[in-house]
Regions:
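AAA+ P-loop NTPase domains with strong preference for DNA replication initiators
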Residues: 1-164
Length: 164
């Protein structure tokens, strides 16, 4: 049973995004946490700045598109890892849309928990602004986001953070 307080928390967090609200509620209910307000807050924390910071750090190191092999049911399967995989995870597993991802990345870049120089921060904010503008014109959110990640990798290499 979902409590009124949990519904109110979800409504506040999702800020009118019905798809995100439904996804959040389904995720909580599937785990039997529909009555637990702290679970809503933990879910939000899990999908906030930590994941965004991690994917920016991966991109700065040039790790945008990487593959690794895993054994799944006795078969070797190639799995996408790296910054692009993190974007996919945020969008698919956590129900964030492209605007949510951009907001999260902006929070990471303007916050001071990511130790980068101001010129690099300016480069990344400019690339993110272009990404945000491109998202408004594109039907496929992954394309502008991937372009942002590649620009981030180029900036990381230019500033000595990535090794090609």
């Amino acid at each position: 049973n979902v409590t009124r307080e949990v519904i109110e928390d979800i409504a506040y967090i999702c800020d009118g995004n019905l798809r995100k609200a439904i996804f959040t509620l389904e995720m909580l209910e599937s785990r039997g946490l529909g009555a637990d307000r702290s679970a809503v807050h933990k879910l939000v924390q899990a999908t906030t700045l930590q994941a965004g910071r991690y994917l920016v750090e991966l991109a700065l190191r040039g790790r945008v598109v990487e593959w690794k092999w895993e054994n799944k049911a006795g078969r070797r399967k190639r799995i996408l890892v790296g910054a692009l995989a993190e974007i996919d995870r945020l969008m698919n597993e956590h129900g964030l849309d492209a605007d949510d991802v951009v907001q999260q990345l902006h929070g990471v870049l303007v916050g001071r928990r990511l130790s980068i120089s101001d010129p690099l921060r300016d480069n990344l904010l400019e690339a993110l602004a272009e990404c945000d503008t491109s998202l408004k014109k594109s039907m496929h959110a992954r394309v502008p986001l991937e372009k942002f990640l590649h620009r981030t990798a180029e900036a990381g290499e230019l500033h000595g953070l990535a090794f090609s």
